[in-house]
């Protein structure tokens, strides 16, 4: 199942829905069966947006790529809206994604991104110059942060970045593709979690310097 639902624990017992509303369910690595169809029907009856995905492995890889920016937003203390608006932050995230695109090409792994753009097209879009205004007013109730940011902010002591950026690093090592930025994001975010360092210890420049 690929989960495309954003949520934030704003305080104990309160979960805020911060974006996305889709579950994609399929058999691994492709196809579907009675269980998949039955689960999707149950989800639809509960007013959840869900669908059967015949190529769920490709969708899971696409979700992993989306999650590569989580460590960056956590270390720099940026919301999704803030990072998406600033060309400096978009450029960093584009470079992180380009490392991943090179690795996936070398490994001959097919992926499917959310939306109509391919991964390479999304990277080109991130590199477009200028500030991007946020769609609508960004307030405390609409501002969204990834799960990794929440892990650091709540001092949970662990993060998932080794499953995200770490996967790209290990694939890069296997196929001889450099992944300097993904490596530094993984390593520094793991250190921040272990040391209970709150979000905001890094910026784009310090991360690039650490990757040299």
How would you describe each model-predicted region?
Residues 26-31, 77-86, 206-211:
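Short, basic, helix/turn surface patches
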Residues 1-75:
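Rossmann-fold dinucleotide-binding core
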């Amino acid at each position: 199942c690929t989960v495309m639902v954003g949520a934030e624990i704003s305080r104990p017992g309160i979960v805020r829905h911060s974006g996305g509303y889709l579950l994609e369910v399929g058999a691994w690595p492709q196809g579907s069966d009675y269980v998949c169809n039955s689960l999707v029907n149950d989800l639809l009856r509960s007013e959840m947006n869900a669908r059967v995905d015949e190529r769920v492995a490709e969708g899971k890889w696409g979700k992993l790529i989306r999650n590569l920016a989580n460590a960056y937003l956590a270390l720099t203390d940026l919301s999704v809206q803030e990072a998406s608006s600033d060309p400096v932050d978009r450029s960093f995230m584009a470079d992180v994604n380009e490392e991943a695109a090179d690795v996936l090409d070398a490994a001959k792994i097919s992926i499917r991104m959310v939306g109509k753009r391919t991964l390479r097209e999304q990277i080109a879009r991130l590199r477009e110059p200028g500030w991007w205004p946020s769609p609508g007013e960004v307030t405390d109730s609409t501002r969204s942060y990834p799960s990794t940011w929440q892990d650091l902010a709540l001092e949970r002591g662990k993060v998932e970045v080794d499953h995200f950026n770490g996967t790209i690093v290990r694939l890069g090592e296997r196929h001889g593709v450099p992944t300097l930025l993904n490596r530094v994001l993984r390593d520094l975010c793991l250190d921040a979690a272990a040391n209970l360092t709150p979000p905001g210890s890094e910026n784009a420049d310090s991360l690039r310097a650490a990757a040299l």
